Amino acid sequence: MSASWVFVVRQEETIKMQLPEKFRRKSSAAAAMQFFYYVVLSLFSINSTGAARRPPLNGTWIRMGMLFDDKMQNDQGIPSCKALPGLSSGQKRLCQLYMDHMNAVALGANQALSECKYQFHNRRWNCSLLDDVNVFGPVITIASRETAFALALAAAGVVHSVARACRDGQLTSCGCSRMGRPKDLKRDWVWGGCGDNLEYGYKFAQSFVDVRERERKFKRGTREQGRVLMNLHNNEAGRRAVIKKAKVTCKCHGVSGSCSLITCWQQLATFREVGDYLRDKYDGATEVRVNRRGRLQIRDPRVTIPTASDLVYMEDSPNYCVKDDKIGSLGTQGRQCNRTSQDIDGCNLLCCGRGYNTLKSTIRERCQCQFKWCCQVECKTCIRSMDVHTCK
């Protein structure tokens, strides 16, 4: 009797950020497609270099994630670029060239929004989504650490989704990963299988997400130019998070567990792991400012210089304690809190010192479950009461 099982060999160090070398390993057909891809990106760069100063863009491409289920496709089942909200001119051109990629982009944005809500569900700003062009409301226009996290997570979502779509054969211009064999993989282990195409996912996300910022030209050293640099930095940090958390996974094949053959491939981490990683980066984000030469520099010289994988921000976070429509803050009134916690989810911090209300709540749940032969589980319904604490 044959047996097989999957295990992770090594995480993080195995997969390096050597993307150009990986692309050179492609077949001639894939290389030709990649050459066309780079030509397109070059055209975008040329067009944006001489662009005049443009006003802030209306909306954000991240809104695609909110429309993923109902408005993404036309009658032929192909994404309609005209129907996609918040795209810049460069993103619209990429959409027209890579229409089959837009479902993956929207899925990536969708999972980023869901992950943002999960990671911040017990914080003062809980990643509330608003039905407007900016998704998060006016708060996303503030160069805060919350904005840095949201943009990084969205960029990571595109890498993650496109890389998986390549592996699953959903896109015409890419397939399984062609990453070279890791040097530290055991000699008798076979490097193959169909791995997630991180290389392609990274490059496509870089072009699609960043072209929006590269089209915007502002006077060197201005706050507007600094915001563009901040966005580009955090976009890159998000993409690198997916690379950082990726792993080499191996499968053992053999009769009766003999493990006579081991095959290995490149695999994405779960997006929850990426979200956890970026949340830690959010907690350690570095405040920066733009200097006269048009470069970002740390505001406090005593702080360690951030790497390309770290998040940066330019403005302090607004007051999320009270409702403020001007900045898009919903406040924390009515939010459920943890009375016994001393962390940010505790009633003292989450309620901003305003106190909290306590209500008795009755919960019905299954209990005392027993297995009955054959083949069902019988349970009783138990009723219990619990205290629910909400911010005043």
Outline where the language-model segments fall.
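Classical eukaryotic N-terminal signal peptides for Sec-dependent ER targeting/secretion
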Residues: 1-41
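Long, position-biased, composition-driven segments near the start of the mature protein
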Residues: 34-36, 45-349, 353-392
